[in-house]
């Protein structure tokens, strides 16, 4: 369970402390998650570089991009101004490209699995948040609008976390 304030907003130290120490801790945790997953799936085993914030994150917002993997320098880059809850999954997503998983759906699934390896509830939440859109779309296709509306009432508390890009 992710701690929330009385307004339903997620409480997390990195939300107030956007220092390089907190972001470094988050990047280190993303690497640790991928390495834990690598113990289970040998294709994901090995060294991972530290995910780096993109200098042009504002441009990435305009393109609705959460990250970018640059294979020639082996850099996993993430959008530094996106909503905090999306950063763990975005970091793991970009790191999964390092292991040759170039298709976005594969990288998304690996990021989801990696985030669940963490003891940090924010990482776990980010992993679940990263796949909720796929689940909602599949539910709509399989069950229709009425069932979707009923399901959305159950997942209403996630609304605040569905924001990919911040306002500022």
Q: Predicted regions span which residues?
A:
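Second-shell loop/turn segments in exported
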Residues: 12-24, 77-81, 92-99, 121-122
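Active-site recognition of the HExxH zinc-binding catalytic motif
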Residues: 89-101, 105-108, 112-113
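Long, well-structured alpha-helical subdomains associated
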Residues: 121-168
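A cross-kingdom signal targeting lumenal/periplasmic-facing segments of multi-pass membrane
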Residues: 56-60, 77, 164-168
């Amino acid at each position: 369970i992710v701690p929330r304030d009385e307004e339903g907003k997620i409480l997390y130290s990195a939300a107030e402390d956007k220092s390089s120490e907190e972001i470094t801790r988050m990047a280190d945790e993303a690497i640790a998650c991928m390495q834990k997953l690598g113990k289970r799936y040998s294709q994901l085993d090995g060294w991972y570089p530290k995910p780096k914030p993109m200098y042009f994150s504002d441009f990435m917002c305009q393109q609705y991009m959460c990250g970018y993997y640059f294979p020639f320098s082996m850099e996993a880059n993430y959008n530094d101004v996106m909503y905090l809850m999306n950063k763990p999954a975005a970091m793991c997503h970009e790191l999964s490209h390092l292991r040759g998983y170039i298709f976005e759906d594969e990288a998304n699934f690996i990021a989801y699995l990696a985030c669940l390896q963490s003891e940090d509830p924010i990482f776990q939440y980010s992993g679940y948040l990263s796949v909720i859109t796929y689940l909602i779309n599949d539910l709509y296709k399989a069950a229709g609008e009425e069932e979707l509306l009923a399901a959305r009432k159950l997942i209403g508390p996630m609304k605040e976390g569905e924001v990919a890009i911040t306002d500022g």
